[in-house]
């Protein structure tokens, strides 16, 4: 039944697109018969990369969309024991599907409104639990078993984007879900206010930030130690200001936090919860004649977060039957962290990236995942090397860790919102955690099949799932189909 609903919804989405977009595109082409050679070439490239025609760059509006389907499975693996939030040791398979409609309208030469509608269906293996670096980034949008989230389409982004010109010179800009502008001032201030994904702006990386074409693992596609403000689906309300000046950029954002860890309801009272995010970016050449980017990230979260050490102390004092991170009075605690994000062009159409992240690890994991420190390194190869210019292949290694306080909490049977091999009825005299760093290796290939249709395999190998040496390793093969509409 669920599969039939997914197919029906997908078909309806594509039918709507054809009815709305193709006539409008035809009208746009008829109204501008004197398109330049450059515009015609760009239109040809666009037709190659998308399933359906798009409006020209000169149009003050933007309409696009995407469909991303990920299938994953894993064979049975060794596990000395399992708990309430464990990744299941028996054979599993699961499919997720995300569809997004991107829209934008330019209301002046410097102001635009962007609005996206999204629909999510399917599921993740083991109800999307048991791995700190979970294998499918798309499942953050999908209601799990027992989730209060609606299965209906939802508003994903709704933001006002204001550009303040500081120079007469322009720079090219890619029209997309974050802007309708084909050009922006080379030196400028940008202000975004509304509903967005924090990592739409912060911790971006052209090699490892897109589960539609690149890596799927949570700790590879994003900085796992960046516990950025977000609701259950990964979105939040906030204001972001950016300053761009050629090689340099600086951005700062004030975001709403959820009322509870990984919750859908946001706390609008800033005296009870809020998050500050800062990032400095410099474009440099770490290698001669090869462009690179270095981004330095910091963030501070203020929310009603529990403290691991207090939860363990209450358990050992007999005040709770097991460590319970949510068993505390209303309080305002602080989590802070830092990150480094590097990408570098290499010879032979290769591009490498690396991330390092750390947070203080004293308070409960709140909005993204249960990682307190991380290191990731990866590489992408462009298909030009084998005469498939639109194809991509990549490999990455991620090593994730948690603080000692976090380890003690899980060892004594405590549960986070994602991991924990303990829980009620699962407590073991010797403890529920034989700690080891969770390590993920991922390989993918994305083949361009036709116009906006892409597909390819993915393979992940996970050591110490949920930071537990008593479980795993796990082999997770997968397959992705993606359509740019």
Question: Language-model features: where?
Answer:
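Outer membrane beta-barrel transmembrane domains
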Residues: 281, 297-332, 353, 364-462
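Transmembrane beta-barrel strands of outer-membrane/channel proteins
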Residues: 67-73, 115-119, 191-195, 252-256, ...
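Residues that define the transmembrane beta-barrel architecture of outer-membrane proteins
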Residues: 59, 93-99, 151-156, 233-237, ...
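Surface-exposed coil loops of outer-membrane beta-barrel proteins
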Residues: 130-157, 167-275, 279, 324, ...
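Signature for the C-terminal beta-barrel architecture of outer-membrane proteins
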Residues: 36, 218-342, 349-352, 356-363, ...
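Residue-level signature of outer-membrane beta-barrel architecture
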Residues: 69, 105-107, 117, 162-164, ...
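Short loop/turn motifs that connect adjacent beta-strands in outer-membrane beta-barrel proteins
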Residues: 51-63, 74-76, 104-113, 126, ...
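Outer-membrane beta-barrel "beta-signal"
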Residues: 156-169, 473-485
